From Swiss-Prot:
This is Ankyrin repeat domain-containing protein 26. It comes from Homo sapiens. The modification Phosphoserine is found at residues 11, 15, 241, 261, 489, 530, 631. It is linked to Thrombocytopenia 2: A form of thrombocytopenia, a hematologic disorder defined by a decrease in the number of platelets in circulating blood, resulting in the potential for increased bleeding and decreased ability for clotting. Residues 529-566, 743-873, 905-1472, 1517-1587, 1649-1674 form a coiled coil. It comes from the Eukaryota. Residues 569-580, 650-660 have a biased composition (Acidic residues). PANTHER family: ANKYRIN REPEAT DOMAIN 36-RELATED, ANKYRIN REPEAT DOMAIN-CONTAINING PROTEIN 26-RELATED. Keywords: ANK repeat, Coiled coil, Phosphoprotein, Repeat. The lineage of its organism: Eukaryota, Metazoa, Chordata, Craniata, Vertebrata.
Amino acid sequence: MKKIFSKKGESPLGSFARRQRSSAGGGGEPGEGAYSQPGYHVRDRDLGKIHKAASAGNVAKVQQILLLRKNGLNDRDKMNRTALHLACANGHPEVVTLLVDRKCQLNVCDNENRTALMKAVQCQEEKCATILLEHGADPNLADVHGNTALHYAVYNEDISVATKLLLYDANIEAKNKDDLTPLLLAVSGKKQQMVEFLIKKKANVNAVDKLESSHQLISEYKEERIPKHSSQNSNSVDESSEDSLSRLSGKPGVDDSWPTSDDEDLNFDTKNVPKPSLAKLMTASQQSRKNLEATYGTVRTGNRTLFEDRDSDSQDEVVVESLPTTSIKVQCFSHPTYQSPDLLPKPSHKSLANPGLMKEEPTKPGIAKKENGIDIIESAPLEQTNNDNLTYVDEVHKNNRSDMMSALGLGQEEDIESPWDSESISENFPQKYVDPLAGAADGKEKNIGNEQAEDVFYIPSCMSGSRNFKMAKLEDTRNVGMPVAHMESPERYLHLKPTIEMKDSVPNKAGGMKDVQTSKAAEHDLEVASEEEQEREGSENNQPQVEEERKKHRNNEMEVSANIHDGATDDAEDDDDDDGLIQKRKSGETDHQQFPRKENKEYASSGPALQMKEVKSTEKEKRTSKESVNSPVFGKASLLTGGLLQVDDDSSLSEIDEDEGRPTKKTSNEKNKVKNQIQSMDDVDDLTQSSETASEDCELPHSSYKNFMLLIEQLGMECKDSVSLLKIQDAALSCERLLELKKNHCELLTVKIKKMEDKVNVLQRELSETKEIKSQLEHQKVEWERELCSLRFSLNQEEEKRRNADTLYEKIREQLRRKEEQYRKEVEVKQQLELSLQTLEMELRTVKSNLNQVVQERNDAQRQLSREQNARMLQDGILTNHLSKQKEIEMAQKKMNSENSHSHEEEKDLSHKNSMLQEEIAMLRLEIDTIKNQNQEKEKKCFEDLKIVKEKNEDLQKTIKQNEETLTQTISQYNGRLSVLTAENAMLNSKLENEKQSKERLEAEVESYHSRLAAAIHDRDQSETSKRELELAFQRARDECSRLQDKMNFDVSNLKDNNEILSQQLFKTESKLNSLEIEFHHTRDALREKTLGLERVQKDLSQTQCQMKEMEQKYQNEQVKVNKYIGKQESVEERLSQLQSENMLLRQQLDDAHNKADNKEKTVINIQDQFHAIVQKLQAESEKQSLLLEERNKELISECNHLKERQYQYENEKAEREVVVRQLQQELADTLKKQSMSEASLEVTSRYRINLEDETQDLKKKLGQIRNQLQEAQDRHTEAVRCAEKMQDHKQKLEKDNAKLKVTVKKQMDKIEELQKNLLNANLSEDEKEQLKKLMELKQSLECNLDQEMKKNVELEREITGFKNLLKMTRKKLNEYENGEFSFHGDLKTSQFEMDIQINKLKHKIDDLTAELETAGSKCLHLDTKNQILQEELLSMKTVQKKCEKLQKNKKKLEQEVINLRSHIERNMVELGQVKQYKQEIEERARQEIAEKLKEVNLFLQAQAASQENLEQFRENNFASMKSQMELRIKDLESELSKIKTSQEDFNKTELEKYKQLYLEELKVRKSLSSKLTKTNERLAEVNTKLLVEKQQSRSLFTTLTTRPVMEPPCVGNLNNSLDLNRKLIPRENLVISTSNPRASNNSMENYLSKMQQELEKNITRELKEAAAELESGSIASPLGSTDESNLNQDLVWKASREYVQVLKKNYMI
């Protein structure tokens, strides 16, 4: 049968702690559970820069990485971990705060689907968890196992974190994949404080896991029951007349946990059982066998039968009365679900005084508990049910089997085909049988063995260490109708374990096997299995009672072989036998009719109930052993009366059934019987007791025979018939012979039993010795394993240290490289700076040379100026001379004229000369002017050039000073940097030296570690050698266990294969899940980015729209401001033009807003009227006071101010009107909205109409009249629609006319403005008259148009009133139609409903049309108002006409005034012309000055730009020079470094050569030492041969050689230890040849010695070769240990080893 053991001390979380993950899929180690290893297994190659910095807690580095954007905030490593995950797992709250402030994603999951909050809670990092919770991390996310952060807090028993999680709305009822809430998890983990805390927080106490078990109830029940039961064994015996009352005893076992899958009957958590290892299976099977004891089913005989009916509620006593048949007592047991069958109840029985009646006391159900407080077993009450429950249970467990298989972690194939399934139930389950004698009513003594029917009863089997229970199929071949539940698989029933057996006074050995007749081969297999189980039990044998029962069972089998098939006999043989000696078996129809019903009832009732029954009292066992021997003795006696007894040579009995006459199966040989009995320590006493009881019981028939003879003698006194007397005497003699034969047979059996007891004692001693040796071996094995584990741990630690050292070395190297690179960069920067300095110096030189050139040019210009001034002076002198000459000539001419007045010819000549001279003078003056202009221009240019040059000089001097300052600063900075660099270089050199020293130290440590490793390997090799020796010593024991181990290995391999397949599938699914999760995360990130982008775009759009609006508002405001400023300027220049500009602004506003146009036009007309009034007043004033123009002007100014005030008033009125207009616009918008709503409703109604048209086709016949009326209404509706359309057309026409009128009004206004302008001019008299005429004509035309529009409006109003009347009529008709429709009844109801819908639709349409009409009416009203406004405008125009007539009159008066004013204006115009010329000259001068200044500014800017460029070039040159210098220095340093490296390499090479020389010298020394060792070994071998000769001459050596071969050579260990050699010592059995028969003769001794010498020589040569090879390879080896015990040889070896060790110490410092 399959035995599966669960681990003790596992986590109570089921699959929670046992679920394994692959290292590739998850973040942790392989085999890591849900709660094991809370941190991450970090590898540098998997991490990015930000991940390394976050895991190390380096906040500055994380900031730097994020600033440089080397990694993102949410970047993931190969395990999908972010920097936040690693910071939380390693407990760095500063890094967490930094990442959270940068707004990283908080709910990102790793490969195990764990968030950073989960890792913080799992690693007990409270600060990190609080930071995450405060920033909005989700506490209700679940990982791969379904665990939330609260689960991890509960598991760690961290109440503070749990309170914080609950504060941030963590789900207290969250379930993981095992359906465990945090409360259930705390209960299962025995975390009392956490449970109390969760209950305070109102956790659900009635929560149920997958198995529908409440840990709350279990824990409460456990707390109540723990103090009531103790762990001691209670063995009490209460014996009454014939039966004993067995009491309960409980022994808590160790590691006897048995998970069950029957979750409906037991409310316990199932555990996923891991793969069982062989060692654990062996130990667990031993311990479970110690803890489990079997119960049994008793066969009771007599006239009455007793059936057990156990009900915990009623506990009634049931007494069943029947024919004399066998009674069946069925006891079904469930195996304990969790690890300790503590209290197993057994019913107590009493035999009543009444001989035929037996009662059963009510028994209390026992409750079994586990010591660790988790697993509790309650025995449920038994209930009697129908026979169908067997099959029902079978089907239920077929369904539950898959769940149980998954819980066990086993495959179905291994479940079905198990090597342990061949074991029988009776083999594994010791049984006790009570077979009491029931007294008959007539007082006759009856033999129970003959009277007892061979029936089926249930033997409850609790297999030792087995989770699987089998029910044997044992069916009677003659009783087909008996219902027996067949089991399909060994693991189907975990709580129902009844087995059915047929008994004939002795329990059958092979009752649990499927085959009906057991064979000898099967018995042999069972015996082997029993021996293997005995060997597995070890040295501890705490409960011998189980084995005693097993012994008794086998003793019974040894004596009598039961026949399984004799379950029924014929009714014909039950009637007329009154002998009392030969009484046939009774198996009538009553037997088989009664039995199956009761048996099935018992079975069905015991199925769901989980009762644990156990019998442990030793006295009870002894008593049952006696009774079990009694019954076969009587059975044999009854069979011997039939004359069919056979006594074989092997002392085995064969029995022939009386009913069918066929022989039953023989028992096995005595050897097999002996093997069956070698399984207990204390079975000798029981066997002796059983033999005694057998001999005593054999005397019982003899006493009955004497009583019979007395009866014959009494009859003989009365009876005279001699023939009958003779017959009676013959019968009596035959009975006496049979009894004597029986006694002889019993004596033979007693002799055999004694022999067997002796053998058993010997075997028991051997077994005890082997068990002790085995326990010692196991202890040694455990110790060796511990040492190996410690060595491995130390090796791992050393490897980790080495790795850490390597990583430190690499980090230091990287730091050095970085510093070197920085140094190189700084050197390059210095070189660049030096180059820039050089370039700046060059620029300075060039600037100085340019300055010298400019100075020279300036000097040249000054020289030229002086020359030109001299030339100018000369020209002035010449001109003065010419003038003086002319004057003299004129004077002379005058004199000559006066003197020579008569000489006309001379005068002509002189005049001609004068003209010529004057022309020359004019030419000279022109030349002088041009020369002056040129000189002036040149002087200006020179002065400008001088100024520029001075400015340039100043700038250059400033730049030179700045450059010098910067140069000094840069030189000082670079000197400081150079000093820092030199210091850093020195530091780096010191660090290099330190690193070299540390490297040397590390190398020394590595060498020491190597030496330690070698020592550890040496120790391990020694341990392995000792192990091998021990294993050779116990090969026999292992050979016996090899079969079981092979089977176990096969099972384990199957399990491993299945687990590997499952793990691969899991890995695949996990990888798929991870990939899907990664894709999901990527898509989610992409979506987030897209949404963020959209939001940004929307924000940008909104911002741009807002900016646009602001810009428009600003633009409008600016436009308004500009317009205002323009108006003000015009008002300052001319008051009339101001009014016109304001009118223009008003017109522009009218153009912008069409709705405001009318109001603005009114204001314009009013302003015009006022203007005309002002003009009239001016004309009157001009008529009255034409002379006082100034006073009039003042009055006009005051009047203009009044006009402005009025204008402001009008503007206020205009604003109010604009508000009114806005309200009207809002009303229009509301009406438009209503119209749109009505249109939408119209569309909806049209859709509904389309749907209803299909339905209305059927109703067309019935509703013809209604349709006609509807058509009329529709016609009216269409007419109304047409009218509305006409109205809209009229409205459009009116709007067009209004637009035309507005255009004409605008034209008129333009003309009025032109008139006003013309008024100002003087020449406007005739033109104005013509324009006035035109205006009059236009006014008349406007009046005509207005009259026509008024007529049209009147007509439209009439049409509207007509439409309204029509609508009213249609409404009335529709109402009448509706009233008329109410009269229709019956069939028209449906049609009425549909028509109502249509009519309602039409009503809605009509309402919409009325609304449209109302809107049209409102529009008409609006048009009326507009017409009224136009009429008002016409009236105003009439007033304008009147004013124009008055103006014409005033014009005539003004014309005269204008004539007077013109003269005054002409004067003013002359003055104005002069002023304008003066203004123009000033403006030109200003422009010239501005242009000159701009030129100067441009030149200055250009000069500045050039100087900046020069500066930049200078800096670049300086920088390049510094860079070059730094590069040169770096090259020098590199060359120095290369020299140092080369020197180091040379030094290393020299050192290596020295070491090589030393090594060669050591090799030579070793060779010499090896040669010495070989010599000493040869001497030792010679001494060994002598010693062997001496020893083998003694007789003691021969005796030891005969018993067992020498397994190991003597004195080997001493040599091995003294030499400190590392070579394995392999023991060889062929060193000494064991001689079985030593001879005393000299020839045999000589032959033996010669053989021994040959073998020793071979071994010595072999060992010498191996030693030489090992010495050459450098490993330490030990030569073959000889058997010399003399002091001389030991001294030699000791000296040699000491010398060798000293040499090693000198050379290697060991």
